[in-house]
């Protein structure tokens, strides 16, 4: 799975509000944050005092050298040595404090990232299915990878850099004023020029940074989709089409990234140029003052160093501005995700039904539903299913078969009417308790990276190895499992491509058998395997459905001849219902569907 790249910056829609919410989130890390800020300030103060102390040694050296040349004295190396040792101690303390604040901020930022990833993972389980059906996998993954990583890296760097930059500017300004107010005024003249140039660059680069963020999501989604379906792409020889689509998106990403990085990269040369102008001005004026005896050589050396240190925070603040924007934009996207409306996980306590009462009886009473208010999929659906019955739902694509399953498991709620289990509305059950009553075997089998034993045990996590093996035998999966290298301990890869499609379905059937649910949903479970494998799967299915209410959705009508009830759907409504023989004798829509399949085979 591709790892989305880290973005540089994007402007948040609500910068202040997002930062306020981020600070509230970090409130339980207040102590390490304050401690890190204090150590950052102390480190900066000791670092700022360095040039002023060094100036004493420089002045002593210059004065002693002149005195030696005139024959009136010598260089006081003892005094210079004491000053340099004191200076060394200051810089060692500054480095120690800087190390401590870096260690604290790294730990703090990673803990914040850890908390966000945990909250996002928990949030995913509470989001409705509709959220994921409207978004690409890459977009959801980018919240956990790209956005959280950007947030962590920006948080780690921006806060301490902001504190040290502001402290440096204030401290350096105080030191410069203590040396020469007039030279300080000259040095400050570079500020308006620097700020104006920075604002111009930021203004022009911002739109390209935003385009870069948006285009990266498109590229991530395309790469993820192509990787997941690379077999289909190759089978249809669509490599050129996919490559053209990717190149188009990649070109847009390149253009926006190149322009944003180029404009951002202009800041440093511009600031260096302006800073050098300041050096020249200070050097000229300082030389005049030194010639007049109003300032010492050491103070000139210290002042020039302070001018350099004064322009560095300005450069850093421009970088901090980008990092803060990047952090706010990433945090805003994370908070938008965390603030998404959730499914109501629990039912009203006054009406809450006990899941133990689910005995397999299902009643659809005048159900009406549409994914959007202006488009109704199911118009008026009524049906009663008795415990243990096998119910087949058939109909053309788009008739509403899969939608019925989603309503039954409360992935969506009905717009009108009701669905009841043993007389209790499905909305009276906690969602988790309701879904525990259902077992599913889908055409798109889902197996995770792990052993075969672990994949089957997913149906009931507390099952023993013996129970797992018994479920595999009941699903006709035990034989092929024993022939695999490593048997039940064989490791499946990420997409389970080291077992066949039929074997995947047998494993999912074994998992469902182990779960021992009262109601089963079998959605197109045998439509993508060969006839012999289908017979094995069908045998396992029959064994699975014994004594359980089962809803079978299949286009192969030959597989549901023995169903107790067949519901024929067209345009969201049940147009016919009955057994296979009854529907054939009626000569209606079901008979047309059934006969058309055999006509296709003959042709």
Tell me the role of every PLM-derived stretch.
Residues 15-30, 140:
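A short amphipathic helical element positioned immediately N-terminal to and/or at the very start
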Residues 28-30, 129-130, 148-155, 159, ...:
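An intracellular "coupling" helix at the cytosolic face of ABC transporter transmembrane type-1 domains
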